[in-house]
Design a protein with these regions (language model features):
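Short conserved segment of the HATPase_c
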Residues: 201-215
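Short alpha-helical segment of the dimerization/phosphotransfer core of two-component systems
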Residues: 86-91
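Conserved glycine-rich
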Residues: 242-243
Length: 266
């Protein structure tokens, strides 16, 4: 019996250590679960809040049209159908953004990297926004240190991040202004800067521009309602590539967003 007690005494510290380790792991998992629940609750709240109005608009105007279709003029019908279309477009865009946000925050989120010409990728993103820039008479200036800058990236994800930043630059820019896009290669990084002459961001709002669901201005310079997830998604994508994104701004003067990507593979 004495021998058994000695053996028991020997294993007690090991057992205590295992229990403590298990407790810490359980606490960590509990914190992760609580964070996930909080995030999901926030998403659900935003879904309800942001979709309630446009869905209500679609229902109301559809009901009006169905009840009085015979009395509708072509002009009135066209106006009401446009309102329905705008509400549906916003709803679909919002759901798409929520889907992207959920994807980049998933534990299974991964990149499909390939060796690409980054200069060409940035140029293709700029081309996609030329029509929008033209509609607001905004000039797009490009300054690339080289036409051939090769990086190992996920093409679709980086395109998404760049598109978000450039879209915001155009959205918050006034008409007859300029947006500058520069790409500069250094020894270990590639720096992309997108600078606009728009409405700018206040010192109070600037530290929170990458926060989830944070909207600096409810309406942009072109009166488009914002969701507040685009830059948060872009930040996740850039950081997944081991990069950094930052913002500087002067209210009523404009903003400058800088994306730094490593030359090394991710």
């Amino acid at each position: 019996m004495v021998k058994k007690e000695k053996n028991s005494d020997k294993y007690i510290p090991e057992l205590e250590e295992k229990i403590i380790d298990l407790s810490l792991k359980l606490k960590s998992k509990s914190n992760e679960l609580n964070a996930a629940i909080e995030t999901n609750s926030k998403i659900l709240g935003k879904l309800t809040h942001n979709l309630k109005n446009p869905v209500g608009v679609i229902f109301s105007f559809s009901e009006m049209i169905l009840e009085d279709l015979e009395d509708y003029s072509a002009e009135k019908l066209g106006k009401h159908m446009q309102i329905i279309k705008n509400s549906a477009t916003f709803s679909l865009a919002f759901l798409d953004t929520i889907s992207k946000y959920t994807r980049v925050n998933s534990p299974n989120y991964s990149l499909k990297t390939e060796r690409i010409n980054y200069s060409e990728l940035v140029n293709s993103v700029i081309i996609d926004f030329k029509v929008k820039a033209f509609e607001k008479n905004i000039g797009l200036e490009m300054n690339f240190s080289s036409k051939e800058i090769f990086l190992t990236l996920d093409r679709d994800e980086i395109t998404q991040a760049l598109s978000t930043v450039l879209n915001n630059a155009l959205r918050y820019s006034n008409e007859n202004s300029t947006v500058n896009i520069s790409v500069e290669e250094t020894k270990n990084t590639v720096e992309t800067a997108i600078t606009d002459q728009g409405i700018g961001i206040s010192d109070a709002d600037l530290p929170r521009v990458f926060d989830e669901f944070y909207v600096v201005n409810t309406y942009s310079a072109d009166k488009q309602k914002c969701i507040g997830l685009g830059l948060a998604i872009a930040k996740k994508i850039i950081e997944k590539h081991k990069g950094k994104i930052s913002a500087n701004s002067i209210l009523e003067k404009g903003s400058r967003f800088k994306i730094i990507l490593p030359v090394i593979s991710v």
